[in-house]
Each structure stands twice: as structure tokens, then as C-alpha cells.
Amino acid sequence: MDDELDYGSDHSIHGDVREDLSDSELQLPKDRLDAIIDRKEKIATEKAFGINDSSDKHLNVSIAETAALRKEIGASDQNSHLDSIYAHGVEAMDEFEIQKMFANFRPEKVWKKDNVAMVQFQYRRDVAAMMLNMSKMMRRVRGRKKADEEGEVLSDDDDVEEGQIMQEKDDDVELIEDLKPNEKGIVASEKNNEFITVDINAREVPNGKWRVLTKHVPANMFVIIRYATTDEYQTMVTSDRSQVKKTGVKRGNDSFWTHESSNRGGLNVFDKEGKELEWDYEHDTRFYNEDKNEEKVEKVKLPQGIKIKGRGAVKCGFLFGEGSSSLASDDTTPVKKRRTDEKDYEKDDIVSRQGSSAHAIRPGRVERPIRERIQFPGREDPDEY
């Protein structure tokens, strides 16, 4: 038959995929070209079957967001390993707990030494997405006592006015009077929730610009992260195994139909011991009503039908309601819908905070979707930037 499928071809179902490739993509090596074709065929198949990839929405970040994030932290290709983070304050956690903390963003490897750890992710965009969804920029402040009855202020910062910004430990420090930090050194602020304000007199913080983890972290822990520098990455990778614990994390087999990985994150809810709870996915019975305010409509009772007798009446009687000729399915209550396993994150609006200077876009330029990003030299994946 002329319309019979060619099962000997790898691309028989979507024969037009190769025609959609650009000239630059056609010049790529065969293995990378095959990867692009496979990905586009997968997208086309999902679209044909109406499969929506909603589980990875938290991984989507734009070029502008990534550029603004790196600018705020001071990271670049020249000084940082952009697929890895450096975490400080994880002395009470083992490698598995650290991996589980970032599980929704596809961590690959974990190295831990004393109270610091380095986590390498699958792609650079995963690191950016994790930072924007799981952390907030740290703002350093220093408290100063209020003046006493005689008007004297007992402080080493007598020459510095309140609110003045100073440079200490490669970061900005603001002087504020009468600070009241909590046990972790964090100062609560109702006016500004874009930053985590930390009193450096109450908590010692390493040099540089850091972001404070706000998701999947026990209440009694203070964990800060940033991009790992090139020197830190080389030191951690080449260290003796007796000093540095290394954990290789399996990626898990992504299901074509469910897009779920075998590495699952927790609920961001912790017990008294500080352990994060997780759902029992095998016996999960969470259900919900889609509309609680749904009006109750009284059913009009139909007159009782004539009882049917004859061949098949007994065998098929379960189809009808008791003493009625109407189908039993018409009288049953609908089954409640099950909650979907969506990742609930609130992304840091870093582009708005930094303004238009964070990422200059030429007039007329249109940012393409994440799957159609341009190929940068030296990247292993077209989506990596």
C-alpha cells in the first residue's frame, strides 16, 4: 500500500521534522543533529496526542532572568562553573539530604566537605531556575544601638549615618539602628520581601554575594548558595575521597507519558526533628472538589418505568437503578478528581528589580521559547545558555 508506514525509518511518522531544521542545524555533527531531531519529534508527538508538559514549568527561565541573576551575584563564564552551586551551612545534612533538597531541579552530583557542599546540575538553566524559585538575594545590614538619655551612641560607626551603604567582605552593608534579628540572624521586614535581610553582627557570613535558600530547608537551618567558582570546583573535584564525600545522583528515567523522574522532592513541610515530609505516592489518596460552591440541583424524579422481563433482564439488571428503567450511572455521584503533582514555586522577579539595564535587548529582537534557543559555542545542549 502506498500509505503504509515505513517502519524501517527512524523518522517515518514525522517526515517533515527534517524540513524544519535550519541551515546551521543541518551542519551539526550527526549525533547532535539526531538529538535535535529526536527532541522535535517528541514535541510533535506530544502535541499530536494532546500531552502538555506541565511538570517542567518551574524549569523555564528566560535569557533576561539568567543574565540578571548572574549580574547580581557577579558570576560569569570566566570566573564560575555555571552548572554548579556552592552551598554553605549544610554541616547537619548528608549527601542524600542535600540532593533531595534540590531534587525538583535535576541535580547530577553532590560533593560535601565539612559545612559546605557543591551540587552539579544537569544543565545551566536548571541552576538558574533553582536559584530564582528556591532562594532570595541576601541583604547585609549591621545594627547600631540607639542613643541613650545623654544622646551618646555606643558604636564604632559614629561617623556613619543611618542607611548609608558600605563595602565589607565584597558586598554592600547598610547601617540600621535597633535591629531585632531572630535566632538565625534574619531581620523580618514587612516593607521589602524581595530580599532576606541578615544582621552580620548576629551571624557570620562568608565573603561575597549570596542567596538564602527559602524552600525545602528546615526552620532551624540557615543555608546560603551561589555559583561555584572555577577554583572551588577544581578543588572539590580533585580532593581526596577521604576528605570530600562524593555522591553520584542518578537522573532517573523520564517517562514519556508522565515526565516524572525517580528523584522526587519533598513537601516543604518538616516534622519536629527537622526532616522533610514526602508523599506516599503509591498509596496517595488526596482528592479535592473542583468547585465547593457548586449549586445543588435537585433531580427530577421520573415516573417508575415498567419492569422488563425476558432474556437478559437478570444479567443486565445492574445497569438500571433499583425499581427503575433509567440507567444506574445517571444516579451515581461523580468521582472526585485527584490532585496533580505540580511543583509550587514563586519565582524571584529579578529582572524587574534590576531594571532594564539587567539585560539589554536590541530593538526588534524577539526572545524565542526555551526549546528554540540559539546554539552557543561549547555547549553540550542547545537549551543551555
UniProtKB/Swiss-Prot annotation:
Record's compositionally biased regions (Basic and acidic residues): 8-20, 339-351, 364-385
Domain of life: Eukaryota
UniProt region (Disordered), positions on chain: 1-20, 326-385
Protein name: Protein kup-1
Species the sequence originates in: Caenorhabditis elegans
